[in-house]
Design a protein with these regions (language model features):
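N-terminal intrinsically disordered/low-complexity leader segments
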Residues: 1-28, 213-221
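Helix-turn-helix
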Residues: 2, 32, 39-74, 78
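Generic hydrophobic, amphipathic alpha-helix propensity
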Residues: 29-37, 54, 79-83, 87, ...
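Amphipathic alpha-helical packing segments from all-alpha helical-bundle domains
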Residues: 88, 104-107, 137-162, 173, ...
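Amphipathic alpha-helical segments used for helix-helix packing
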Residues: 117-140
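Hydrophobic/aromatic-rich alpha-helical bundle segments in the mid-to-C-terminal region
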Residues: 141-146, 161-221
Length: 221
């Protein structure tokens, strides 16, 4: 389940300190390349941005670029991995702010996503965008996308299980569908649709939770 902060990490430079140990660039130069790629890939699209354009934006030589990222696809994988790590860290922070209150985490997520997905500069979910540009489901880029989607469903299922739902995984999959739709609606609708996107996500999410609530389970979200 992607926290609202993911929208900010998607089109802003990815700070190496936010990327997590598994994807932290090996050097400041690699971090600069990754930051330049993050801005360009998200704003203009992956296929539309050449390696030469990233090299120019990062102000590095071709030799330096390819030393850190042997191919453009390797750079795309590194970028998406950094975004995924930042999103997971952001959700960890939200959960830490509401210990033991899964309902509060879900409600806060709905409100935050409505705001973030409608702000100027938002270009949709970077993982959905990447999947649209890489048709081969076996491509390494699609593998990163698939892993992040599994994480979203698993995280949402954990929160929903805490609410006593009889099918938390099924409910989680439905919430992720709502999340995807909200991000598209926010991108197309713009800032003036923020309240509507948040309200729709909140109300539809509550309906999903209600539909999967085990009989006799107290209403907490």
């Amino acid at each position: 389940m992607t926290p609202p902060a993911a929208a900010r990490t998607a089109d802003a430079p990815v700070d190496a300190a936010d990327a997590g140990p598994a994807v932290r660039p090996a050097s400041p130069v690699a971090a600069r390349v990754l930051a330049a790629a993050a801005r360009l890939f998200y704003s203009d699209g992956i296929r539309a941005v050449s390696a030469d354009r990233v090299i120019a934006a990062a102000e590095v030589s071709k030799v330096t670029f390819y030393r850190h990222f042997p191919t453009k696809d390797a750079l795309v994988v590194a970028w998406l991995s950094a975004v995924a790590a930042a999103e997971r860290a952001a959700l960890d922070a939200v959960r830490a702010a509401h210990p033991g209150d899964a309902g509060a985490v879900l409600r806060g997520y709905a409100e935050g996503l409505g705001t973030e997905s409608c702000r100027p500069g938002f270009r949709g979910c970077p993982f959905i965008n990447a999947a649209a540009e890489y048709a081969d489901p076996d491509h390494p880029v699609r593998a990163v996308v698939a892993e992040h989607r599994r994480w979203m469903v698993g995280t949402a299922a954990t929160l929903l299980a805490d609410l006593g739902l009889d099918d938390p995984v099924g409910a989680a999959e439905e919430l992720v569908v709502l999340r995807d739709g909200a991000m598209v609606a926010g991108y197309v609708g713009g800032p003036e649709r923020a309240a509507a996107v948040a309200a729709t996500l909140r109300h539809a999410g509550a309906a999903v939770v209600a539909a999967h609530r085990a009989p006799g389970t107290p209403r907490t979200a």
